[in-house]
Amino acid sequence: MHELIESKGVPIKAWTNGVPVEPEARKQLKNIAELPFIHGHVAVMPDVHLGKGATVGSVIPTKGAIIPAAVGVDIGCGMAAVMTNVTASRLPDSLKGMRENIESVIPVGQASHKQPPRRAEAAWYQRHKAGYEAIEAKHPKIMEKKSAALQIGTLGGGNHFVEICLDEADRVWVMLHSGSRGIGNRIGQYFIAKAKEEIEAAGLKLADRDLAWFGEGTQTFNDYVEAVGWAQDYARSNRDVMMGAVLAVLRETWPDLETSDVAVNCHHNYVEREEHFGERVWLTRKGAVRARKGELGIIPGSMGAKSFIVRGLGNPDAFESCSHGAGRAMSRTAAKERFTLEDHLAATAHVECRKDPGVIDETPMAYKDIDAVMAAQADLVEVVHTLRQIVCVKG
């Protein structure tokens, strides 16, 4: 069940029972709720925390406007997961080689492919090149770096990951988390700056400059919708190509590996035209997953906690949404100051993963309790599978 957060604007309905919400995040949510074009109310997921531009874990319905900073710069960031026919009994004694093999085919961090693999090249030419060129013709500054074709099938950094997991029946799953990489970042930054320029030129004063918007019917609105739609499609392809590469690596160990019908590829940072409460609106999910009735989604825990394949319950008050993970309990800086490498080693003892100072900001203790997050959204989703990580590749 949700609780109400009071605001001077539309109601804020928050699925946060038993989950802490920072005062700064509450303030940010109230700023969103006071915008003049919010439709009905703002929904807040239990993994909510302070974000850049808008609150992570918020679902924002708008009429006649889109806020580029609410979508953010990792446009189309999301998850993919597939179940295989392989079981835990067939795992090798050491999983280090499996992790290294995945790292050999998936560039991580800032890295790109030096030469795109066939899957990536096919995706670029068949699905993305024409749209890229159309955006480039109108906004050449976005496309100054020619990395987009070389970054399909690459992971990125931060909280992006590739994981090998086991479910409740000890079946092997592949799960990964990534978005639109450098090109999505440039599209986001470019249009966020444009929106701020337009609002300032109009003489409008905002409680938060990051909440600048494009009004529907303007050229910049249309250009943003075109560019953000392209980036969201690119992000989905990025996950598809990575999934294909990981499965190919696993087939070197298990030539008879097959995938089941249970496969999910879902965004959690995006904007889309949807119908809610009888009205067509622009719905921005900022760190939230669509959870229509019967629809499968993915809610990952941290790199040491369990994750969930869920089925949506189609809750209308949540705009048919659920959380996109556990949610950070503290900032990356705070995590680095608070936790030691020894803390991280203890928390990830059961996972074959990076165990160095470079990933302490992603240590499990930096995230909220995933069980509390799931309990808070029991009326949004039901759990179909529970996954535990055994291999984790981080950017």
Kindly give the residue locations of the regions a language model identified.
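Domain-length cofactor-binding catalytic modules of enzymes
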Residues: H2-Q28, F37-V42, K52-V56, I60, ...
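Beta-strand elements of modular eukaryotic interaction domains
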Residues: A33
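A generic, well-ordered mixed alpha/beta core segment in the N-terminal half of proteins
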Residues: A69-A134
